[in-house]
């Protein structure tokens, strides 16, 4: 079983960069949400462990589902039926797997059911997904538009 996160040591290295301490503390508002949300980290090590575990899940889904569907998705493509776009079967399967795993809204605040991830681990997740299927990453990656809105 392929995992597009655990097989790439460069990605794991990024999480341990010294600036991540400052970035995470800022994003987590000095870990002030730890009493409000059950899954909010209590300190940097807890946050870093969370990012690592989530990226491992993204890597597993990307390596075993998204990459496996990529060829057929390209062959099938999306369809326009009754003025509605219908994704290729594999695209829908990819998206459903990431939704089921809670990987939509990664960078959104917890109050909007997001994971409150800093941009660095979110971009790392996008790199992992794009390795499996760059076209699908375009669809999955639109989730950060919610921050702009």
Give the ranges of each region predicted by the language model.
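Extended, charge-enriched "interface" segments that sit outside catalytic cores
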Residues: 1-81, 85
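Glycine-rich flavin
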Residues: 71-149
